[in-house]
Amino acid sequence: MIFLIDHNLKGHALVFLGAIATQGWLDIVPMQFVTFAEMDLSINSDDRTVWRLAQENQMILLTANRSMEGKDSLEQVMREENTSESLPVITVSNADRLLNDSEYRGRCVESLVEIVLDIDTYRGARRIFIP
């Protein structure tokens, strides 16, 4: 599974992916994290553009801070464009704890792996908060 890492989680993603690898999950569940830069996506892109790019490329958007209000907010885009086949957006509930709390980070890893292993169950779910 490929994850599009929101620009506000770029540094966090390194720690997160390291925890996934340390726990041995990458040997069992192929996962790849890609950045906005790797996708030629501006960090100033609106949520509609980001969501569409992720869906078109079969990537799960991993974020901690996307807008909830406005015509191009992530929430509005998902209401308008989400289908039963859409991949969910995964939102880390507390990005600071992801960096600083190994127990919390471990729970985030478990949640992420569970979602990937059973991705078809989560299609169409719009947004999933972890942990």
Which role does the model predict for each range below?
Residues 47, 55, 59-80:
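Acidic, metal-binding active-site segment of PIN/NYN-like and related structure-specific nucleases
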